[in-house]
From Swiss-Prot:
SUPFAM superfamilies reported in the protein's UniProt record: Release factor
Positions where N5-methylglutamine occurs in the chain: 230
Its job: Peptide chain release factor 1 directs the termination of translation in response to the peptide chain termination codons UAG and UAA.
Originating species: Leptospira interrogans serogroup Icterohaemorrhagiae serovar Lai (strain 56601)
Entry similarity comment: Belongs to the prokaryotic/mitochondrial release factor family.
PTM: Methylated by PrmC. Methylation increases the termination efficiency of RF1.
Major localization listed first in the record, in broad terms: cytoplasm
Record's subcellular location: Cytoplasm
PROSITE patterns: RF_PROK_I
InterPro entries: PCRF (IPR005139), Pep_chain_release_fac_I (IPR000352), Pep_chain_release_fac_I_sf (IPR045853), Prokaryotic/Mito_RF (IPR050057), RF-1 (IPR004373)
Keyword set, alphabetical order: Cytoplasm, Methylation, Protein biosynthesis
One protein family per Pfam: RF-1
Protein name per UniProt: Peptide chain release factor 1
NCBIfam families in the cross-refs: prfA (TIGR00019), PRK00591.1 (NF001859)
């Protein structure tokens, strides 16, 4: 344990030294990110090593101490040190877990209507509102990238960006199928309808992670259309980009400017290519899947929102809240906290069995 902690200490100090000498912006960014990730661990290591040294000194002194009062004080000092070291060792179980490679990234969140017709479209809008309110409470910037309104206040699809180094860690468990059970306002018989929407959480790609060559793209432009299919723009401002090597297709029509739509489409394209690369890696490694709370796949049913009963259930961890109204207002802290804790427990268990 001590050897491992001293190596972490050395690594942190080496990165700090490299930061003082680095001039390349890309290197500086990576070094700052790595040091920021290591800082909480480094501070705990410093604390642990100091207590460990103090305990060792006390153990040496107690061997030759003849005074009863002093002997008793040293014994108590050793006991307290042992308790502190045990607490820190439990914290290290979490801090020493391998970092998620996507932690610290900005993300794109994509919500699409699934089964359920107009009700599904309305719930897409409800989920976007829920996520926006949660992001606002966390002081995270939200930017709509593209959306397709239904004309009755719903959305066929919406893609939005969340820009903050906490965004991925807070939203990474949202991917999958979200099911809603409620009585539509148009339902005169009071029957409960079930509909579903899918959520995808896409980490934004760094330039070095996804390099897109212009020659690999087919770019089509067309007139954007609004709810019901009517054309809302008389110029060809909407953009569809096909990445020929992967077959990934992205369309964007939210902006009136073709240039802005192209820039947004390229942003989505980069994230989707990164997602495809991650999926390919997942298929090659079952071990990664076992470490996750669910797969994050669009087809996996992750949560049910039952409005008549005021209940929200996350099926992956058996979490149930009977305060659905608060959740829909963006009060997601308890739910996300439970998912994060369960993920930590599973990862710790996984490391202990290897």
């Amino acid at each position: 344990m001590i050897d491992r902690l001293e190596k972490i200490q050395e690594k942190y100090l080496r990165i700090s030294e490299e930061l003082n000498q680095a001039k390349d912006p890309s290197s500086l960014k990576n070094l700052y990110k790595e040091r920021s990730r290591l800082t909480p661990l480094y501070l705990k290591v410093e604390e642990y090593l100091k207590i460990y040294k103090d305990r060792k000194d006390a153990e040496e002194l107690i061997q030759s101490e003849k005074d009863e009062e002093m002997h008793s004080m040293l014994k108590e000092e050793i006991r307290e040190a042992n308790l502190k070291l045990e607490t820190l060792e439990r914290e290290f179980e979490i801090l020493l877990l391998p970092p998620d490679p996507n932690s610290g990234k900005n993300i794109l969140v994509e919500i699409r209507a699934g089964t359920g017709g107009e009700e599904a479209g309305l719930f897409v809008a409800d989920l976007f509102r829920m996520y926006s309110k949660f992001a606002d409470k966390q002081k995270i910037k939200t930017e709509i990238i593209d959306s397709s309104p239904t004309g009755i206040g719903g959305l066929k699809e919406i893609i939005f960006a969340l820009e903050d180094d906490r965004a991925y860690d807070l939203f990474k468990f949202e991917g999958g199928t979200h099911r809603v059970q409620r009585i539509p306002s148009t339902e005169s018989g009071g029957r409960i309808h079930t509909s579903a929407v899918t959520v995808a959480v896409l980490p934004e790609a760094d330039e070095e992670e996804v390099q897109i060559n212009e020659s690999d793209l087919r770019i089509d432009v067309y007139r954007s259309s609004g709810a019901g299919g009517q054309h809302v723009n008389t110029t060809d401002s909407a953009v569809r980009i096909t990445h020929i090597p992967t077959g990934v297709v992205v369309a964007c029509q939210d902006e009136k400017s073709q240039h802005k739509n192209k820039a947004k489409a390229l942003r989505i394209l980069s994230a989707r290519i990164l997602e495809k690369q991650a999926e390919d890696k997942k298929q090659a490694s079952d071990a990664i899947k076992k470490q996750m709370i669910g797969s994050g796949d669009r087809s996996e049913r992750v949560r049910t929102y039952n409005f008549p009963q005021g209940r929200c259930t996350d099926h992956r961890i058996g979490f149930t809240s009977h305060n659905l109204s608060a959740i829909m207002e963006g009060d997601l802290d308890e739910l996300i906290g439970a998912l994060t804790e369960e993920d930590r427990v599973r990862k710790i268990s996984e490391t202990q069995t290897h």
